[in-house]
Amino acid sequence: MIVYPAIDLRGGLAVRLAQGDYARETRYAEEPLALARRYADAGARWLHLVDLDAARTGRFAHRELVARIAAGSGLRIQAGGGVRSLADVEALLAAGASRVVVGSAA
């Protein structure tokens, strides 16, 4: 079994939405890269990242953050959120993602 810890990104922060409701957001104090490193230290090999800003607006806001996490955590990245085109897939792969999750709107 492979466990995929997940970090949802919004406004550059690690967050969690209650039942997908943007009005009910929990913000975590830990910087996303530090949180990813903590998952790696706990034995994770993969990390699932979701760009909630891109999921909502269709414009990626966290490519640079995805790249920093991919380069600095030692984890393989599965990324998604707002992926609507082949260009979006290519951009996430170029940022260091090993896998890209494409939503139904693609």
Model feature map: region roles:
Residues 79:
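Conserved phosphate/oxyanion-binding catalytic-loop motifs
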